[in-house]
Amino acid sequence: MSSKFHTYDIEEMTPTEIYGEVLTQMGKAREEIVTLTADLAKSTKTKKFASELPERFFNVGIAEQNLFGIASGMALAGYLPFVSTFAVFASLRASEQIRTDICYQNLNCKIIATHSGLSFGQAGTTHHCTEDMAVMRSFANMTVIAPADGYEIANAVIASADYPGPVYIRIGRGFEKSVHRHHDYGYEIGKAVTLHEGSDVTVIACGTGVLHAEKAARILSENRGIKVKVIDMHTIKPLDQQAILNAIDETGKIITVENHSIIGGLGSAVAETIAESGKLCHLKRLGVPDSFSGVGHPEELQKYYSIDTEGIISAISEMVGETPEVDKETKVALNDDWKNVV
C-alpha cells in the first residue's frame, strides 16, 4: 500500500486523530474528496480537514438524516464524500438514508463512524453502538470494516477511497493502543491478517478485540504452552471465508471477539460460514450479549463482557479443556504493558 498518506506520528496521535490527518492529506491530493459531518468535527477529528480545506468541508448541523442525503447527492455529482459522525447516529438514526439513498444506488460514499462499540463508555447506552455491524452488513452493496488500531484505520481509509461503492468503517473513540508495528503489513480490504500462528485454537477478532486476542495468545503460549492462532478479521463484509475454513481445518476450535453484540456481527458472520461449510467446529462468540450495554469506562465494560485479555484467556482455556480460572502466573503476565506487540 502506498505510504504517501502515512504522514502521522503513531506515538503522538490517537487513532481518530490519525484518521483526520490521513483524510486531510488525501483531500489535498484529490480534489474530488469532500468531508461532511453533523456538528461533530472536533469529536470525529475532521476539524483539520475543515481548517485546511474549508471549501470542501460541510457541517450540516445536528441533522444526520440530512447529512447522508446530502452526501448521496454529492456522490451523484461526482464527488467522493467521506462522512463522519458517531456510529450510533449513522447506523440507527440515519439507517434509512444510508440504505435507500446510498446503498440502493450503490454510490461511492465512505462512512467513518467513530465512538463505536463500548468506546464511549460513560455516555451510556444512548451513545454506545453495539448494533452497527449487524445493521450495515445487512445492506446490499455495503462494505463493512472494523480496524484494529491507528495503522489499520489509516490503511482502511486510504484503501476505501479506491474501493467502489459504499464503505462503512467503524472506529473507537480514539484511545486504543496499537497492535501493528507499522502500516506496511499487506493490508487489503476483504483479506484477513494472521498475527499469530497456533494449532490448538483460533481466535478471530476485529477492532479492539485484536490487541486483546494477541496478548492472550502470547501469554498462553509463554506461560501455559497453549498455541493460539490469531486472525485480524478487519473486514466483516466481504468476509474472508477462506481464512475461516483454513482455521477450521487447522484447529477445529474458533473463538470470535468483537466490541459489538454477539448477534449479527463478526461472530454471526463466522457462524454462518461454518454452518454452510458442513465442517465440524467448536465455536464460541465473545461480545455483548442480547442486552443493552451498561455504563462505565470502556476498559471496565470490556472486562464485564469478557472481551478483554483475561476474558479471552478464560474462553480459550475452557475450550481446550483446562480450567477457565486465570492462575496467578497468568495474572502477573496480564499486568505487563503489551503495547505494539506485533
What are these model-predicted stretches?
Residues 1-170, 175, 186, 329-342, ...:
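Thiamine diphosphate
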